[in-house]
């Protein structure tokens, strides 16, 4: 099972479990391209097929939010294991978004506020790994997951300041990745390097045009 490295609250999450209970998802809205795409479609896709399926959604989202499509794609690849992780397959959750993030005080969330999947995960606290059951957001489509993730990156607060301030005003993927790292998105030191490699290897910047 793919390991997902994600930091929603300044702690690393290593997700290897699968959903054990779920609530029904809401209907997706606000995204037209690929709005009905389900993560189950990724199960037998090649890497290029995955990029071709998610790319148009990421590009449209970039035009709306300023979060580069290349960054969205690289994060989705890294955090969902090319869409094949247990959480992604069961819940269309491409980024390991928990039900509670930054106090849920940020605007523009595409999540319905109630649909979730309970997943067993291994989290790291002060260098020690523990297994817990956590609640993760469940989405009606891949597009809804991407929209919610971009809203979080655009509007999440850290006190009185935006957690990822300046992210949506730069068109440099390296700068966006640096802002994510500085904002505490992921505590794994190799995160930016890993995403940079994915962007270059699969020519993900082509979706930023």
Show the residue positions of the predicted features:
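Catalytic cores of secreted/periplasmic lytic hydrolases that degrade extracellular macromolecules
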Residues: 2-209
């Amino acid at each position: 099972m793919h390991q997902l490295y994600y930091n929603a609250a300044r702690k690393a999450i290593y997700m290897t479990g699968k959903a054990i209970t779920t609530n029904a998802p809401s209907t997706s809205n606000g995204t037209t391209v690929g709005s009905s795409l389900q993560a189950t479609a990724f199960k037998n896709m090649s890497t290029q097929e995955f990029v071709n399926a998610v790319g148009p959604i990421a590009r449209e989202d970039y035009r709306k939010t300023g979060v580069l499509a290349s960054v969205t794609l690289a994060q989705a690849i890294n955090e969902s294991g090319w869409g094949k992780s247990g959480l992604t397959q069961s819940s269309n959750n491409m980024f390991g978004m928990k039900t509670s993030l930054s106090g849920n005080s940020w605007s523009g969330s595409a999540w319905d506020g109630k649909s979730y999947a309970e997943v067993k995960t291994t989290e790291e606290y002060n260098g020690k790994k523990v297994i817990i059951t956590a609640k993760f957001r469940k989405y009606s489509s891949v597009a809804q997951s991407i929209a919610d993730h971009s809203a979080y990156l655009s509007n999440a607060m850290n006190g009185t300041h935006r957690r990822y301030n300046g992210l949506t005003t730069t068109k440099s993927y390296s700068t966006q990745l640096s802002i994510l790292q500085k904002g505490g998105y992921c505590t794994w030191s190799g995160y930016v390097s890993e995403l940079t490699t994915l962007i270059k290897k699969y020519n993900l910047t082509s979706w930023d045009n």
